[in-house]
């Protein structure tokens, strides 16, 4: 029985990419800088001491990082029994965003430039917002700027609740975000508005619209909820997910995976929010997954709760929690199953600003008869998609080199 389990540690980069300078990200290293902060006692909130990831270490994480950056992360050692195949991958895609990383992993790099709203204030063209407001029956909106999602709630959340006007904002990514209160504005109203925005953005080549619902009574307790929804454009070609689905296989999305691929190539969708719930849901799907199945989970909290918010201790705590549960997952694997752990970009919580960082990502592969040891530098995330295609004996992808023969 052949099954592949893809665990996407959203934003868990392992060192600046070769082209990081073009993004202002030279020196970024999500894993390495978290490990350094932990070793220096600077991440002791809710945890203590050096970063402890024994199960990921056995899969080759620290060695992959060493090959990427030239040095072992602080607190990690070469003296560990490696049981998996490990490597690091550069990104071919032009951006450091979520769709680009996910699509490239599945064999379809984004080789064109996304559209962006580059102005930090008055970010959106009036022609665009006028059309959105007219279709949505709204008189105005708030925001129109680059912002952190939590900061803009503190700034504009109260005004939104009293005025009923949605909050529009963006970032360095190719994205249009809409924040609205679940109760005063209404969740379904937010989703309807975001669908309108998605349709009106077609000429602008924007990768995603993100619905950002929140709850609370004021700045001190405003909190974004798990009812986020992403409205992505479709990948420009068939991914390995599509190819498996077309061949009669199953592709199970856990978390926001289906949204990222615009629901293309997905046969089953499992909603879950939060690291624990996502892991629980993943284990349940692994227990029932049949032959020719991919179970694909995005662990978004690493990025949204800790990377963007520059919360080093929170990121470290969550990595340690994730690591502690890996044995449960591995115990469910059959001898022919393939486990892949990777990331879609970096989001170094020690880095200036709140945006993603252009980094290499880990490629940790276990099972399916793979020999433990180094896979070396992979020229594209698409090597993972090509390897999945090889594993399932699908038609080869256009991009990528398989490490499964």
From Swiss-Prot:
Compartments it resides in: Cytoplasm
EC annotation from Swiss-Prot or TrEMBL: 5.4.2.7
SUPFAM superfamilies: Alkaline phosphatase-like, DeoB insert domain-like
Pfam families hit by this protein: Metalloenzyme (PF01676)
Binding positions for Mn(2+) 1 per the UniProt entry: 10, 344-345
Cofactor dependence: Mn(2+)
InterPro entries: Alkaline_phosphatase_core_sf, DeoB, Metalloenzyme, Phosphopentomutase_DeoB_cap_sf
Pathway: Carbohydrate degradation; 2-deoxy-D-ribose 1-phosphate degradation; D-glyceraldehyde 3-phosphate and acetaldehyde from 2-deoxy-alpha-D-ribose 1-phosphate: step 1/2
Protein name, per record: Phosphopentomutase
Record organism: Shewanella sediminis (strain HAW-EB3)
Lineage of source species: Bacteria, Pseudomonadati, Pseudomonadota, Gammaproteobacteria, Alteromonadales
């Amino acid at each position: 029985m052949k099954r592949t389990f893809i665990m996407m540690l959203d934003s868990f980069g392992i060192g600046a990419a070769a082209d990081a300078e073009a993004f202002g990200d030279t020196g970024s290293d999500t894993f390495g800088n978290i490990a350094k902060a932990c070793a220096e006692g600077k991440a002791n909130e809710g945890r203590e001491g050096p970063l402890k990831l024994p199960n990921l270490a056995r899969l080759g994480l620290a060695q992959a990082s060493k090959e990427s950056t030239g040095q072992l992360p602080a607190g990690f050692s070469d003296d560990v029994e490696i049981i998996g195949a490990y490597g690091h991958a550069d990104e071919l895609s032009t951006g450091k965003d979520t769709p680009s990383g996910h699509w490239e992993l599945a064999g379809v790099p984004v080789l064109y430039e996304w559209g962006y709203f580059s102005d930090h204030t008055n970010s959106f063209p009036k022609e665009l917002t006028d059309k959105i407001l007219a279709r949505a029956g709204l008189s105005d909106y708030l925001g129109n700027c680059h912002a952190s999602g939590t900061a803009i709630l503190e700034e504009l959340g109260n005004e939104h609740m009293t005025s009923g006007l949605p909050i529009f904002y963006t970032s360095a990514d190719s994205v249009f975000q809409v924040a609205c209160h679940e109760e005063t504005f209404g969740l379904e109203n937010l989703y309807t508005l975001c669908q309108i925005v998605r349709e009106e953005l077609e000429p602008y080549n924007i990768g995603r619209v993100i619905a950002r619902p929140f709850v609370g009574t004021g700045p001190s307790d405003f909190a974004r909820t798990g009812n986020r929804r992403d409205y992505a454009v479709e990948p420009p070609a068939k991914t390995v997910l599509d190819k498996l689905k077309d061949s009669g296989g199953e592709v199970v999305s856990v978390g926001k995976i289906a949204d990222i691929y615009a629901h293309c190539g997905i046969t089953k969708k499992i909603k879950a929010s939060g690291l624990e719930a996502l892991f629980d849901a993943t284990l349940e799907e692994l227990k029932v997954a049949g032959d020719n199945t991919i179970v694909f989970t995005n662990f978004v909290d690493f990025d949204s709760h800790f990377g963007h918010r520059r919360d080093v201790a929170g990121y470290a705590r969550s990595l340690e929690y994730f690591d502690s549960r890996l044995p449960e997952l591995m115990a469910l694997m059959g001898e022919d199953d393939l486990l892949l752990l990777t990331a879609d970009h970096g989001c170094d919580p020690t880095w200036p600003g709140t945006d993603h960082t252009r980094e290499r990502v880990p490629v940790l592969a276990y099972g399916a008869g793979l020999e433990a040891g180094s896979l070396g530098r992979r020229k594209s995330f698409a090597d993972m998609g090509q390897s999945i295609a090889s594993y399932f004996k699908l038609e080869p992808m256009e991009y990528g080199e398989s490490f499964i023969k």
